[in-house]
């Protein structure tokens, strides 16, 4: 008797939602408490089954538990190489055989970036420094994205964030960047001085990404005009 979850997702994602973990665990219910006689991995073409076997806590000879299975699924995703994972349970006289069906992330081919105006795509590619023609690792991407956000911060764009990361089946890594656009200025507390007299001194412009360095310079220019104490 075999029990396997529904068809795996067709489009890669760079995380494992809690709901997806729950769905992956559901078929285990009839086998909880039974002895695990064998663990195997299928679907891996580049990565090694031994890497998965090394991180799972449920071993042959142990009882299958819901908590242990959930922990193991999380650990396998935590390796960063897979965008989908489904456990299969096969009933045998001695207990149950457990097979992990994995789908590896695509091989990285090219980078596309949307929303970037202050750091060019070519410069972002250098900052990320991801190896091409190799299977993408989610953990590596997340670390490199933090490096990109740190570079934005260094340049003064402290509100800039990578809002979304997508790995497309053709090997394209797509980054959606939100640089923290200034939508408007509001001036409060000025009784005698008109708003435009203050805002014209601002180096920051509406529709441009917020820059902390420009904001400080703008405030200094306003104070230097002697409008305020």
Model features per residue range: what roles?
Residues 2-229:
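Periplasmic polypeptide-binding modules associated with outer-membrane biogenesis and secretion
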């Amino acid at each position: 008797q075999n029990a396997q979850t529904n068809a795996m997702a067709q489009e890669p994602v760079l995380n494992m939602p809690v709901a997806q973990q729950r769905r992956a665990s559901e078929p285990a219910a009839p086998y909880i408490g039974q002895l695990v006689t064998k663990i195997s991995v299928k679907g891996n073409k580049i990565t090694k089954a031994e890497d998965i076997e090394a991180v799972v806590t449920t071993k042959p000879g142990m009882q299958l538990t819901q908590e242990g299975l959930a922990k193991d699924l999380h650990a396998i995703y935590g390796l960063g190489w897979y965008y989908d994972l489904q456990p299969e349970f096969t009933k045998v006289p001695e207990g149950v055989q457990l097979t992990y069906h994995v789908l590896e992330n695509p091989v990285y081919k090219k980078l596309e970036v949307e929303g970037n105006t202050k750091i060019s795509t070519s410069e972002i590619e250098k900052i990320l420094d991801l190896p091409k023609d190799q299977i993408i690792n989610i953990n590596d991407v997340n670390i490199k994205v933090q490096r990109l956000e740190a570079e934005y911060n260094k340049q003064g764009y402290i509100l800039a964030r990578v809002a979304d990361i997508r790995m497309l089946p053709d090997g394209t890594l797509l980054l959606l960047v939100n640089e923290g656009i200034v939508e408007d200025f509001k001036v409060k507390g000025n009784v005698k001085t008109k708003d435009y007299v203050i805002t014209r001194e601002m180096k920051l412009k509406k529709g441009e990404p917020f820059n902390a360095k420009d904001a400080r310079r703008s405030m200094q220019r306003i104070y230097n005009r002697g409008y305020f104490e």
